[in-house]
Amino acid sequence: MDLAGLLLDEEGTFSLSGFQDFTFLPGHQKLSARIRRRLYYGWDLETDCSLEELSSPVADITVELLQKAAPSPIRRLQKKYVAHVSREACISPCAMMLALVYIERLRHRNPDYLQHVSSSDLFLISMMVASKYLYDEGEEEEVFNDEWGAAGGVAVPTLNALERSFLSAMDWRLYTDPREIFEVLSWLESCVAEQQGRRRGWYTYTDLCVLLEQPMWQLSLGSLCQRLVKLSCLLAVAYVSSVALAVASMAVIHQSLGLSSSPSPSPPELTLVPKNLLQPCIPAPVPQCLTNVSSCLEDSVELPSLWGSLLDPLTPPLMPPPDPPAPPTPFHKCPFCQKFQRNPPNCRACHQPNRTVSIGPIHPFYHTHGLAPPWLWSPVAPPFLQPQQCSLFSVMKLARLTSVIFPG
C-alpha cells in the first residue's frame, strides 16, 4: 500500500498533491508569519519572497556577525557570497538561526578554532551542518556535500575536512534547545528593526513593536516617560503660578487705581478734649433757684471740674487775646464771686485776674435786668464774644466758699 492510500480517509477526499503544505508543528504557521513580518521576508509567495533564501537585512546581520567572530583576513565574507550560497543551497531562516547558535557556542567553548578559520568557510560549514541537523538523511530537502561545495566554490575534500574540524570543535554536540532558537530569533529581530530604522530614518509599527519587547528598550522608554511626566508637572506648576501672579498683579493694580481715583478723606481730628471745653468760657446766667443757690452752683461746677482735672495736663493753655478798650460802665460782674466790682486788676473775693470786660455797646436787655450775656445759640447773641480763660481750680474754691455762705 502506497502513502496515498494510507492517508485517505473514509470518504477518500485527501490528496497527496498538497502534502508539501502540510505542517506537523502546531505553531509553524505563527512562526512563519512572525519570520516573514519581522525579518523582512515579505508576503508574496509567488515571487522571490519565499523562505528558501535569506532576506537582505538578515544577510547584512549575518555578514557583520561572522566577520567579528572570525577576524581572519583570508577569504573575508561578503554579502554577495552569502546571497549566492543561500539561494543555491536553499538555506531556510531556521537553519541560519541554528548556525548562529553554533557559532555562539564556539565563541565560548573553543575560541581558538575561530582564529584559524576564515569567515567564508565558517559561514559555509555552519550552514551545512545546521541544514543536515534539521533535514535528516532521506528527506527531499537534503543537500549533499558536493552540492554544498558547488554552491560555495569549495572542493569536496576540502569541504569534508572543514566539516570534520567543525564537528570536532563543537565536540559533536549539535542538539539545541528550542528556547535558544527563540532567543536568537528575538535578538535577530531587534537587530534588523534597529538597523532598518536607522537606515530609513524612521521606524515602522512592526519595528517599534519589536524594539519595545526588548528589556533595554523598555528601560529606556520608562526613564524617558518619567522625565516627560516630570517636565509636564513642572510646566503645569509654572503655568499655574504665572496665572496666579498675573491675577494678583491685576487685582493690586485695580485696587490702587480705585484708591487713587476716589477722594481722599480728611484726617480725623485727634483731640482728647471735648469742644465745649476748648470754647471760650462764657459767664453763665444767674440761676433762678434763689432758695438753694449752693446746690445749683455745685451742679453746674461738678462736671467741668471732673473733666478739667483729667484733661488739664493734656491740653496746652490758650493764649489770652489782647484786652479791648475800657468799657464805659464802671461796674463789672465777676463770674466767680457773683458780685459787682469796680475796675480792679484782681477780684477781691477770689483773687483772680479780672477779665470780664465787654468790648461792644451795652445791650439794655440783660444789663437793665442784671443778667449775664446770652448763650451762643441765642438769637440776640452779641456780634463779638470775648474768650475767657476760666480756672477750674478757682471754680472749686468758689464752690466751697458758696457752700460755707449758703449751707444746706
Swiss-Prot record:
Q: List keywords of the entry alphabetically.
A: Membrane, Transmembrane, Transmembrane helix
Q: Which domain of life is it from?
A: Eukaryota
| Pfam families cross-referenced by the UniProt entry | Cyclin (PF08613)
Query: Which CDD domains has this protein been placed in?
Result: CYCLIN_ScPCL1-like
Give an example GO molecular function: protein kinase binding
GO cellular component terms listed in the entry, alphabetical order: cyclin-dependent protein kinase holoenzyme complex; membrane; nucleus
Q: How does it sit in the membrane?
A: Single-pass membrane protein
Q: Where does it localize? A: Membrane
The family annotation for this protein states: Belongs to the CNPPD1 family.
* Official protein name in the record: Protein CNPPD1
Q: Which gene encodes it?
A: Cnppd1
